[in-house]
């Protein structure tokens, strides 16, 4: 739904549902010279006329479509005639007028094409104008619908709120309620009746309101006047005149009559004053009613004027459209006459050509009659042969047409087969696409897994590099520690053991990669460990024996020999036990070194394979 504002300040809406089924009725009424109804008649009797503006517009759109079809057919006919005229051969070389005829016909056809294009443009412009008119009509109808809705809302509000429950509100009698209900139940076509009823009720309500207000003000004025009269000296004289005895009334009768006459005059003046106060109220009331009536009349007159202007504009537009239709019909008639004349000229030209050809043949026959008499029989035979050939050619033509039809059928079947194959290929393509998509998803998953493995291997490589650096530091510290220990023990060791220790230390230091060649370094280190352990043990035992000999110098020599013998036995047993432990520990360390070396090689191979896979993936997916 499209909303827009028109210059008169009314808010209109344009619905897309244009009821275009009753166009012919409005156009018939316009053509027959019927008068357009006024605003009141159109709004109160719209249901009987069934909205005649919309069918006219629909009929015009149908006419436009039919005219466009006729124009296209005429253009096709003209093109066919032009091609036919262009392909007619110039059989008579002495007839140069055929080219001039074709040029003349071409010029006529071009002029007709220009007129057709101009008519098409005019039709499009009129179609746009009709659409704008239809939109304006719909907006006015929707505006009237909005007015009806507001009136219905006001009437329902009056019926619900002006009831007997509210004491201060205006009470509706039975007739007023019935008229309001009947007006509320009327359809949206009776806008003015609803407006009249609503305006009458509002006027009556305002009159009652002003009348009640004037009565209240008059009562208030009377009360104020009485209070003033009682407080004045005339009021006190009236009271004193009501209270005296009958004796005073009889004696002073004349005086009392004078006073009564004066008091009556005073009361008359007071009544005149009261009437003068009520006059402005009635004047205000009448003035308000007059202004309200004039405003309502002005509004109704404005609505009448707008409706009349709208109907006049529609009438002018439809008159223009009728004139345009007449012009188009005349142009089409002229075009059909031109086409008929072209056809007649074609037929006449073909007849003339045939006659010229026959005349030339007759002249030739007259000139060569003597020669043709001798060859007449041969010509007859040739004619018979030509007829036979013609029959044969017609049969061949029929067979060729049949063959062409069969070929067309075959081509149709072939096209259908190709379409089926295309559909099958489309299905296979979609299936293969799904398969490739699944494979791609799997490859993405594998790529993700390989990336994770590569990350884990990188982490392991970092850990191994840390282990390797730590091992190198540990090996260097261990060798320094062994050198320091050997320097300490060098004072009491033999030269052969010192040389052996130097060779082992040099061989250990000469190994390039200590972590990878751990199986070569491990036994040498273990031998150094055992060498140092035995040296320390012998030193400790000798030290202990020296301490014992120093503590007991008085013991006999025999006990000394026994003591020296027992430590030597213990030392030998200790050395044997240490040798066994050294051998078992060396074997265990060899096994551990071999296992760690195999594990390192497996990890390196896995790292290389993952690197190659990652390189291949980077090449395949740039």
Swiss-Prot record:
Name the domain of life this protein comes from.
Answer: Eukaryota
Molecular-function annotations in GO: microtubule lateral binding; microtubule plus-end binding; protein-containing complex binding
Return the Basic and acidic residues bias intervals: 239-250
Offer one example of a GO biological process linked to this entry: cytoplasmic microtubule organization
Look up keyword Protease and say if it applies.
no
Q: What keyword terms does UniProt attach to this protein?
A: Cell cycle, Cell division, Cytoplasm, Cytoskeleton, Karyogamy, Phosphoprotein
> Which protein are we looking at?
Gamma tubulin complex adapter SPC72
Its taxonomic path starts at: Eukaryota, Fungi, Dikarya, Ascomycota, Saccharomycotina
């Amino acid at each position: 739904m499209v909303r827009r504002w028109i210059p008169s300040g009314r808010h209109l809406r344009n619905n897309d549902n244009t009821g275009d089924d009753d166009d012919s009725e409005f156009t018939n009424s316009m053509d027959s010279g019927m008068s357009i109804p006024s605003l009141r008649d159109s709004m109160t009797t719209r249901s009987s006329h069934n909205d005649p503006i919309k069918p006219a517009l629909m009929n015009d759109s149908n006419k436009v479509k039919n005219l466009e079809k006729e124009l296209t057919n005429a253009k096709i006919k003209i093109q066919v005639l032009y091609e036919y005229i262009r392909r007619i051969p110039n059989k008579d070389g002495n007839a140069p007028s055929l080219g001039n005829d074709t040029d003349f016909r071409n010029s006529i056809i071009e002029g007709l094409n220009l007129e057709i294009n101009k008519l098409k443009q005019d039709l499009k412009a009129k179609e746009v104008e009709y659409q704008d008119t239809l939109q304006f009509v719909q907006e006015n109808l929707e505006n009237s619908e909005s007015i009806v809705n507001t009136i219905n809302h006001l009437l329902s509000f009056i019926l619900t709120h002006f009831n007997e429950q509210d004491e201060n509100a205006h009470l509706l009698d039975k007739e007023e309620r019935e008229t309001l209900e009947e007006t509320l139940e009327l359809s949206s076509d009776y806008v003015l009746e609803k407006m009249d009823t609503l305006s009458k009720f509002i006027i009556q309500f305002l009159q009652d309101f002003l009348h009640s207000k004037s009565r209240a003000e008059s009562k208030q004025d009377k009360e104020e006047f009485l209070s003033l009269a009682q407080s004045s000296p005339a009021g006190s004289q009236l009271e004193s005149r009501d209270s005296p005895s009958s004796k005073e009334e009889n004696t002073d009768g004349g005086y009392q009559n004078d006073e009564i006459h004066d008091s009556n005059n005073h009361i008359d003046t007071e009544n005149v004053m009261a009437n003068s106060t009520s006059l402005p109220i009635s004047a205000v009331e009448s003035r308000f009613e007059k202004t309200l009536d004039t405003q309502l009349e002005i509004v109704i007159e404005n609505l009448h004027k707008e409706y009349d202007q709208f109907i006049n504009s529609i009438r002018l537009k439809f008159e223009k459209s009728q004139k345009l239709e007449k012009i188009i019909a005349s142009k089409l008639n002229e075009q059909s006459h031109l086409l008929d004349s072209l056809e007649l000229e074609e037929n006449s030209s073909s007849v003339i050509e045939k006659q010229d050809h026959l005349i030339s043949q007759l002249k030739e026959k007259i000139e060569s009659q003597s020669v043709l008499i001798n060859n007449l029989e041969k010509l007859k035979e040739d004619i018979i042969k030509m007829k036979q050939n013609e029959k044969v050619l017609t049969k061949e033509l029929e067979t060729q047409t049949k063959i062409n039809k069969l070929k067309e059928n075959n081509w149709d079947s072939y096209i259908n087969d190709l379409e089926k194959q295309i559909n099958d290929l489309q299905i296979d393509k979609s299936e293969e696409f799904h398969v490739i998509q699944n494979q791609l998803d799997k490859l993405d998953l594998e790529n993700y897994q390989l990336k994770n493995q590569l990350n884990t291997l990188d982490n392991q490589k970092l850990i191994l590099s840390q282990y390797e650096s730590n091992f190198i530091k540990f090996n260097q510290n261990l060798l320094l520690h062994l050198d320091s220990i050997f320097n300490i023990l060098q004072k009491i060791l033999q030269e052969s053991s010192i040389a052996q220790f130097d060779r082992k230390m040099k061989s250990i230091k000469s190994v390039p990669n200590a972590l990878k060649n751990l199986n070569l370094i491990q036994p040498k280190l273990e031998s150094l460990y055992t060498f140092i352990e035995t040296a320390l043990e012998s030193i400790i035992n000798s030290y202990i024996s020296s301490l014992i000999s120093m503590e007991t110098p008085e013991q006999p020599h025999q006990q000394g020999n026994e003591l020296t013998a027992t430590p030597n036995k213990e030392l030998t047993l200790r050395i044997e036990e240490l040798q066994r432990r050294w051998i078992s520990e060396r074997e265990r360390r060899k096994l551990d070194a071999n296992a760690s070396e195999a594990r390192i090689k497996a990890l390196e191979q896995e790292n290389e394979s993952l690197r190659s896979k990652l390189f291949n993936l980077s090449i395949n997916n740039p």
